[in-house]
Every structure is written in C-alpha cells, then in structure tokens.
C-alpha cells in the first residue's frame, strides 16, 4: 500500500534469529539495546542481583521466613530454589551477543565514511563499528563475571580450579546441547580477555545508559 508496512518488519532487539539476520551496523545497536533492557529485569540488576551479594553479607537481613529471598540469607539454596532466572537470562543475552560477534565481522566497512547513528551522533563507520563491538565485549564480560560470582567459588579458594559456569562464546545451533562447566580460572581469563579487547575499541566519551570506557 502507499503508506507501507515497513513497521511490520521491525525485529525485537531481544529475539534475534541465528541465520545472519544482522546486516547493517544499526542492527547491532538494536541487539545491544535488547541486552541493556534485559539486564534491567527483576532477575538481574532490576532486583535480584543486589540480593545475591547483600543478603549473603552484613548489609541486608531477611525478616520473613516465607520471603522469596530467605534462601540467600540462610545460605540454603540448591538446584530447586537457587537463582535460575539469571542463568537462563545470561545464556539468552549471550546467544544474541554471539550472533552479533559472528555477523559484525561480515560487514564491509568504508572506514572513513561518515554516518548518523540512531542516537544522531556523527561518526565514521569504523568508529561506530568499534563502539558497538567494544560495548558487546564489555557486556559479555560483565555477564560472565556476575555468573561466576553467583555459581562459582571465589578464585582464592583453590586458585580458580573449582567449576563455575559453561562459557559459550560462539553461536550454537543445537538447542539440546549440554556443555560442561568451565573452571573459575577459565571464566576469569575469558572475562579479562573480553575487557582488554573492549578497552581498545571504545571511544573515551560518556554515553548515557551505555557501558563507557
């Protein structure tokens, strides 16, 4: 029709197909927006993440035995009452980031060409690419850091030899895959590698609501 149906083609930034659906730089910003949005949920920084640490320390106290967070306060959580929501969220966000990492390498840049980003910034394609990839690396590092803190032992317990969480750093087509857990040391190595690469890419500017250098 004359008014068009382009709005029907808008893709949710939290539900990305694995078949190479990301073809323009601005597509990758939508993926990052989805990651930031998911990180604000009640299973993560919107609520529970503060309880994981503070309720197990001296800063907070759970007064009701029926509280949904009493298991953290009493250190009596297991595979049935533990923080499962964050586990699923981590791998959901991680899947989208891995698609981003795969597809962003296929973009044919004109490095010096100036473009206008969805935030109305004037950047070269190379600057925009670097920002997007740098943010994605930093987000992946933060997610793995938090997962390792929640589901793994402290590094100093045994120099990182104990098991933490599986590291999934590429697109996995098999939905039934059951990867083995990596050690705490392996997780922290992946975290520091991602952050080191992110620092090299991010511009030294402040971006509201985004990860900054």
Question: What residue ranges belong to the model's regions?
Answer:
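Membrane-proximal, proline-rich intrinsically disordered regions
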Residues: 3-57
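Solvent-exposed, polar/charged alpha-helical surfaces in well-ordered, non-transmembrane soluble domains
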Residues: 26-29, 33, 37, 95-102, ...
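Conserved alpha-helical segments that form or flank metal/cofactor-binding pockets of metalloenzymes
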Residues: 47-48, 143-159
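Short alpha-helical hairpin
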Residues: 54-78, 167
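Conserved, well-structured interaction surfaces
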Residues: 68-151, 178, 182-185, 197-210
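Short, flexible, mixed-charge acidic loops at enzyme active sites
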Residues: 156-171
């Amino acid at each position: 029709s004359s008014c068009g149906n382009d709005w029907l083609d808008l893709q949710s930034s939290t539900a990305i197909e694995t078949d190479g659906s990301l073809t323009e730089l601005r597509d990758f910003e939508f993926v990052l927006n989805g990651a930031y949005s998911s990180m604000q949920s009640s299973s993560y920084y919107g609520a529970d993440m503060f309880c994981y640490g503070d309720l197990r320390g001296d800063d907070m106290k759970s007064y009701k035995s029926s509280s949904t967070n009493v298991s953290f306060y009493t250190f009596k959580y297991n595979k049935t009452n533990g923080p499962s929501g964050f586990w699923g969220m981590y791998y959901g966000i991680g899947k989208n980031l891995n698609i981003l990492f795969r597809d962003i390498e296929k973009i044919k840049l004109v490095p010096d060409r100036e473009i206008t980003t969805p935030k109305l910034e004037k950047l070269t394609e190379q600057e925009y690419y670097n920002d997007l990839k740098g943010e994605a690396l930093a987000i992946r590092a933060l997610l793995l850091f938090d997962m390792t803190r929640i589901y793994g032992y402290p590094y100093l317990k045994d120099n990182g030899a104990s098991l933490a969480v599986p590291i999934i750093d590429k697109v996995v087509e098999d939905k039934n895959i059951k990867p083995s857990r990596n050690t705490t040391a392996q997780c922290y190595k992946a975290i520091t590698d991602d952050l080191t690469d992110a620092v090299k890419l991010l511009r030294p500017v402040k971006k509201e609501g985004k990860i900054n250098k």
